[in-house]
Regions:
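Glycine/alanine-rich phosphate-binding loops at beta-alpha junctions
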Residues: 1-48
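Terminal helix-turn-helix DNA-binding modules in bacterial transcription factors
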Residues: 16, 20, 29, 52-88, ...
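Basic/polar phosphate-binding segments, predominantly the helix-turn-helix DNA-binding elements
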Residues: 29-62, 85-107
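Mid-sequence acidic-hydrophobic segments that form the walls
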Residues: 77, 99, 103, 114
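A solvent-exposed interaction/effector surface
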Residues: 94, 102-106, 118-326
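Winged-helix/helix-turn-helix nucleic-acid-interaction surface
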Residues: 111
Length: 326
């Protein structure tokens, strides 16, 4: 393993360790000294490498992650504010309030009374991003079959940002990063704070486990994709059809009517070694599917939405809009 590869993995291990300690309430282990010792490097060197790779100070990252977990409890439970503060390593109600307001511009009590969208510090995934950038560390074959089935999805709303020119996940976020307030960290943090997401499985990362999905919307102004369909790429969350909560100003929301979809699904996979193989396998399955025999065809009507769920702990799943041909 190269030194660069090794340090991306080291920082990823630190990030995972931080979340484990916060979740378990093991605050004594959540120190720079212990994290550095576990890697066999000095505190100074680990701090420097963390900042270099993640783009932020390690102590700041730990504080923001504590606040992100605390905010979810404020939003989703009736636990007392002081109890939440102490559970997440703050010494008093006042210390928690100061840190919370400095991070989100609102006090914990005001947020609980009126939970507006705020930018949470989602868990960073430096090693995953590095692997995607270099195409992974291997091309292990996946032995799982692709499941193909049809579903009817009820009417819902889709809160999102969109881009009419991007080509794929990385290009999407690269282009969005040049739009004020629409970079990946800001958007994922805002979406993480939204309550009531239909696909939220309680995950702590900015992926399908926390309800965040990539989508492709049939739009005549969009780029022509490899399937010959003009699409706008989008990123957001599905919400109930009657959702009436506040909406971040840089996002848009659309009504998605009830419709029929075809699903191409691969089960859990190892991101580091199987991601590329899973992508190739599921792309081939979509290419080979015989729509004529099924009695369905892809629905290219403007506004139909094609969802992409990527959560290596559960599945890789494409959900494409269809309509009956007979």
């Amino acid at each position: 393993m190269s030194e660069i590869n090794e340090w991306y993995m080291n920082i990823q291990n630190i990030v995972d360790d931080i979340d484990r300690c916060i979740k378990s309430g093991d605050d004594e282990k959540l120190t720079l000294g212990r994290l550095s010792k576990s890697l066999g490097y000095s505190e100074y060197y680990v701090s420097r490498k963390f900042s270099e790779i993640s783009g932020m100070n390690l102590r700041d990252y730990m504080r923001y992650r504590r606040l992100a977990f605390a905010l979810r409890e404020l939003r989703d439970t009736d636990k007392g504010i002081l109890d939440i503060a102490l559970d997440y390593g703050f010494t008093s109600h006042e210390a928690f309030t100061r840190a919370f307001k400095a991070a989100y511009g609102i006090t914990p009590s005001s947020y609980r009374s009126h939970p507006v969208p705020v930018i949470l510090r989602t868990a960073i995934r430096p090693f995953d991003c590095y692997l995607l950038g270099i195409g992974g560390t291997g091309m292990a074959q996946t032995n799982s079959d692709i499941k193909v089935y049809f579903v009817t999805i009820p009417a819902h709303k889709f809160l999102h940002i969109r881009n009419y020119e991007s080509i794929g996940y990385y290009d999407f976020w690269e282009k969005q990063s040049h739009i004020p307030g629409q970079d990946c960290a800001t958007i994922c943090g805002l979406l993480d704070s939204i309550k009531g997401k239909l696909d939220d499985m309680g995950g702590d990362e900015a992926d399908s486990g926390s309800g965040q999905v990539m989508a492709y919307i049939n739009e005549p102004e969009g780029r022509i994709c490899s399937w010959g369909i003009p699409l706008a790429e989008a990123y957001g969350v599905r919400l109930p059809a009657d959702y009436s909560g506040e909406m971040p100003k840089q996002m848009q929301i659309m009504d998605v009517p009830e419709g029929e979809y075809i699903v191409f699904e691969h089960g859990p996979f190892d991101f580091q070694t199987e991601n590329s193989a899973v992508e190739a396998k599921i792309e081939q399955a979509m290419k080979d599917f015989d729509y004529e025999k099924s009695g369905y065809e892809l629905d290219k009507t403007q506004g139909r939405v094609f969802y992409f769920y990527h959560d290596c702990k559960r599945y890789w799943k494409y959900i494409r809009p269809v309509r009956k041909t007979v």
